[in-house]
Amino acid sequence: MKKLLHLFFPLSLRVRFLLATAAVVLVLSLAYGMVALIGYSVSFDKTTFRLLRGESNLFYTLAKWENNKLHVELPENIDKQSPTMTLIYDENGQLLWAQRDVPWLMKMIQPDWLKSNGFHEIEADVNDTSLLLSGDHSIQQQLQEVREDDDDAEMTHSVAVNVYPATSRMPKLTIVVVDTIPVELKSSYMVWSWFIYVLSANLLLVIPLLWVAAWWSLRPIEALAKEVRELEEHNRELLNPATTRELTSLVRNLNRLLKSERERYDKYRTTLTDLTHSLKTPLAVLQSTLRSLRSEKMSVSDAEPVMLEQISRISQQIGYYLHRASMRGGTLLSRELHPVAPLLDNLTSALNKVYQRKGVNISLDISPEISFVGEQNDFVEVMGNVLDNACKYCLEFVEISARQTDEHLYIVVEDDGPGIPLSKREVIFDRGQRVDTLRPGQGVGLAVAREITEQYEGKIVAGESMLGGARMEVIFGRQHSAPKDE
């Protein structure tokens, strides 16, 4: 049973639309039809009453009161409006005259009806109605068909009661006119049957049209579902914004979400790449220290602080990049104050261990008063990448100098290597771009350095060094000190 229910529930939008609209159409059709039929029925009753009242007036005109007796003379040429039977009563309810002797019909007339004008109905079985219409062969044939279908069927006859006050020539009379043709056999009664047929035909025609309308109306949703499937299959990057007005906001928000998720994914991937690159230096120092321990060039007591320092740096770098990955655009930068000289001393010390075999000579010309305003890890990451690049490509010498203004910090790194061709001085800051493809590397370090300096409204300018190699000028902006709390 549950499986069967799952096949139908939850219902699709098309089925919901079809069922809801069909229900509305059915209810409205029934409501309008019932109003029309009730109105027609009321109008039919009024018309019938007027016809029977006219018949009653005719008999009142033909009636004569002579010798305390009622006489009604019917001319042979009178054309009655419909087959009827007339009964005339006095004010006490006593039958004075009957057009025909039909005992069962006389018993059906209620005494209360004779007190006032009114329109009533009486129920009779098919056989009694047949006796009442014994002279009408066409009606008899119809009654026979009804009898064959249902021998216990009842026929409804309309009854009009009209009370006439006493006059100088006539006492008070009550004339009852009975329509001998039952309502069920009148052509007007067929309206009820027609209504059923019309309603059925209406539904049979409307449901296919509603299905077409639902298909056409829900095409934008089907198109959206198709685009979502294409997104899942990686055949599409964004949803088509050219859709219906009702779906525009949804599509726009979904596209924003997709773009945000894609940017977050790219950011995580970039951060992971940057983290991998940043761990190269401390891992290289650890590797160099382990070699020194193995060759007994360094004692355990000397190697321990070096290794602990690099492990601490690895931990800091992991925390730093995790923090960067979780930061959103526009996050305020740290406003901490850090002396530049000690930070560069630690970096050069680590790089000397990495490039120990190469014998790189790194010289510093940094005033103790020069400070960096910002996050320490940002500074270490930028200068670590720039200095690593200088040590990698230099022949022997690397020189570092710095100066500071109210708003900017300038750090210049020069080497005596082959330098950077003029045509490559902008390309090297793009991810994956390298001047020398023969040396190991991924082309990530300078790109990371530039991205961080841009967060400080700064930049890195590549040029030619007086030593004959490359000259990298790192410029940090936003270096005004934060106001101190008093």
Swiss-Prot record:
Q: Where is the HAMP domain?
A: 215-266
Which Gene3D superfamilies does this entry report, sorted A to Z?
A: 1.10.287.130, 3.30.450.140, Histidine kinase-like ATPase, C-terminal domain
Detail which positions bind Mg(2+).
N385, Q442
GO CC terms, sorted: plasma membrane
Q: Which residues carry this modification: Phosphohistidine?
A: H277
Reactions it catalyzes: ATP + protein L-histidine = ADP + protein N-phospho-L-histidine
State the membrane topology.
Multi-pass membrane protein
Sorted alphabetically, which InterPro entries does this protein's record hold?
Answer: HAMP_dom, HATPase_C_sf, His_kinase_dom, HisK_dim/P_sf, PhoQ_Sensor, PhoQ_Sensor_sf, Sig_transdc_His_kin-like_C, TCS_sensor_his_kinase
Describe its function: Member of the two-component regulatory system PhoP/PhoQ involved in virulence, adaptation to low Mg(2+) environments and the control of acid resistance genes. In low periplasmic Mg(2+), PhoQ functions as a membrane-associated protein kinase that undergoes autophosphorylation and subsequently transfers the phosphate to PhoP, resulting in the expression of PhoP-activated genes (PAG) and repression of PhoP-repressed genes (PRG).
- PANTHER family referenced in this protein's UniProt entry, alphabetically: SENSOR HISTIDINE KINASE YKOH, SENSOR PROTEIN PHOQ
Q: What is this protein called?
A: Sensor protein PhoQ
Which organism is this protein's natural source? Escherichia coli O6:H1 (strain CFT073 / ATCC 700928 / UPEC)
Its taxonomic placement starts with: Bacteria, Pseudomonadati, Pseudomonadota, Gammaproteobacteria, Enterobacterales
